[in-house]
Amino acid sequence: MKVIKLEDLLGTEREVDDGNWVSRRFIMKDDNMGYSVNDTIIRAGTETHIWYQNHLETVYCIEGDGEIETLSDNKVYQLEPGVLYALDKNDEHMLRGGSKDMRMVCVFNPPLSGREVHDENGVYPADLD
């Protein structure tokens, strides 16, 4: 069994800061669970282009506010605590932080190795290992 405290991830290689967001990576590929779990803060007032061509992601908002826009149809969905979205079609999207930082629990399949950052197209590489 694994028990992981957020405070133990802070300032380690499992905390990745991209400027618009900071991701604390609880479960990663090397944990051999078949998925990864991140606690991610989307900073207020930011906009991030994301297109997970190699991963499926489910995201649950637990704090703050913002919005997600799917670029294939320009639909905008408001995000607030209690809202979950699933990028089940590798949806290209814009993620926007609202008036305050937004905290999200993110699950990826296949799992992240932990070193991923978005490329110029908003994509994580298929596998860094």
Swiss-Prot record:
The keyword Lyase applies. Its EC number is 4.2.1.108. CDD domains: cupin_EctC. It is an enzyme of class 4 (lyase). Pathway: Amine and polyamine biosynthesis; ectoine biosynthesis; L-ectoine from L-aspartate 4-semialdehyde: step 3/3. GO terms for molecular function: ectoine synthase activity. Keywords: Lyase. It catalyses: (2S)-4-acetamido-2-aminobutanoate = L-ectoine + H2O. GO terms for biological process: ectoine biosynthetic process. SUPFAM superfamilies: RmlC-like cupins. It comes from the Bacteria. Catalyzes the circularization of gamma-N-acetyl-alpha,gamma-diaminobutyric acid (ADABA) to ectoine (1,4,5,6-tetrahydro-2-methyl-4-pyrimidine carboxylic acid), which is an excellent osmoprotectant. This is L-ectoine synthase. It comes from Marinococcus halophilus.
